[in-house]
Amino acid sequence: GYKTEGIISSQDIAEAIPKSLQDNIFDMTQLLLRGQIQSVRELVHDLRLQGEDEIKLIAVMLGQFRTYLQVKLLSAQGKSEQQIVSSLSDCLGRKVNQFQVRFALRDSRPLSVAFLKMTIKILVETDYQIKTGTLDKDYLFDLALLKIVSNR
């Protein structure tokens, strides 16, 4: 996928640089929240081909949805972005990135607390089912994604 002629654009560079798992999960979450399940499936397929495991995908997604829920609850208490960064940093025992909070505030705005709690519950249950080997992990992960989309 390298360009052999013409001017190299920033998009060409972006396409040539592999995305981090975090970036891919962020994209997947955005697609999921927009109900674009086919695009989500394609991205998950690509991640599986890259050797990413469902348990790892769930762990990163859980982190993202927990952050959404935390910033939504703190924002509802009237806390500013800076106060949220400070509260989460204290709670987690590590410095939380301000941009992560800013994007989480923006992305969680249209989501209900009930939806976020339900999504976290679905991901935790799916993680448990995969780890206990009740059913095929690909099937369980796909089912979790469908449940999340249908609860939006």
Language-model regions: role of each:
Residues 1-26, 31-34:
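Long, charge-dense, solvent-exposed interaction surfaces that engage phosphate-rich ligands
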Residues 24, 33-152:
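Helix-rich C-terminal "collar"/helical-bundle subdomain used as an assembly and partner-interaction module
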